[in-house]
Amino acid sequence: MDDMDISACNAVARLCCKLTQCVAVTIICLLPPSVIAIEASGEVAAAAELAGPDRSERLLAKARAEGKLNLYATMGQEQISVLAAEFEKKYGIKVNIWRANSESVLRRAVTEAKGGRFEVDVIESNGFELESLHIEQLAQPINTPHAVHMIAEAQPVHREWIGNRANLFVFAYNSQKVNRDELPKSYADLLDPRWKGRLAAESDNIDWFFTVGQALGEERTLKLFGEIVRINGVQMRKGHPLLASLAASGEVTAVTATYNYFVDKLRKEKSAPVAWVAVAPAVARISGLALSRRAPHPYAAMLFIDFMLTDAQRMLPSMDLIPASRSEKALPAGVDWKFVNPAELVKQSEKWSRLYQQVFAGAAR
């Protein structure tokens, strides 16, 4: 195991320690791989590598024999419930959903595996958490003919997860308080004194900040946002839904980076005066699906993954979600989207978390 692998594994170990609120932790990736790796069962490996002209028929027959699957998901409860219901209607296979935030899903998957409890079949989460499962050797490499239809950023080389949708980090603003001609085109535009006292930011936006840093360079990024904080101040709040709601209500005028989904939902469902614009460097993040190495219902799990890469892709836009399928062409055009690199983020997450806190430590609260 090389130094970069150890660095990535130690980052995951620290994250899992934080999530489980442990007092002390053995850096798990310094242990022999046999201690931390969960070996796939024969049926899981067979389901994951199923191929041939009759793959669909064999997969469906074995999936129906299993009759159900267990899903840990981070997608919104309403959205994942609709997708699961459509899957159940089409195939007659029950989907048991446990929905939580990405940190909780990762914590449960890791904790159960280390305790020898194997209940989950499919984990649906953000790229960072899925890459963490890869490092922990809890996810099974999968072979699905539908992977080739996803954008390149949704296809990690190791094949231990596959992306099915994208989240956009966007500049959100109250459309009654900000004129269109005021909107920034790049983050450097936020140095303008017109933004003094008008900006808010998420208190833990590490994946966004890391990717901006990758695009602009570390030194330039730290200097730029340090100056924005010094000149104009930034209110720090916890939670992307909260930030979108605060912009909609006018309690804050604008948000440096939040998810497009929450803004679109407020505007669509409540006719709220909130909108968004992509600001350079514009950041996008992939979310996806992983198959547990000890999935109790591996064929049903693979059938569900196939469904999420096909039928579900056509359903996502109506839910204000962005499919990862090339054929859907759902990413807003005319924008040079910089995708979060989950593998690199896992290796550098501790560093960029520290830098983020340093830059925004003096922000107005």
Identify the role of each PLM range.
Residues 83, 220, 224-227, 287, ...:
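Short amphipathic alpha-helical coupling segments at ligand-binding clamshell hinges
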Residues 170-177, 213-215, 285-300, 316-319:
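A bilobed periplasmic-binding-protein/Venus flytrap-type ligand-binding module shared by bacterial periplasmic
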Residues 195-204, 307-328:
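Periplasmic-binding protein-like
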Residues 330-365:
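Extracellular/periplasmic bilobal clamshell ligand-binding domains
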Residues 53-64, 68-70, 74-94, 318:
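Short, polar/charged alpha-helical segment
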Residues 129-132, 253-273:
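A ligand-binding cleft/hinge motif common to bilobed small-molecule-binding domains
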Residues 70-84, 96-113, 117-251:
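Extracytoplasmic ligand-binding site segments that recognize negatively charged/polar headgroups
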Residues 139-146, 160-163, 267-283, 292-294, ...:
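Short beta-strand->loop
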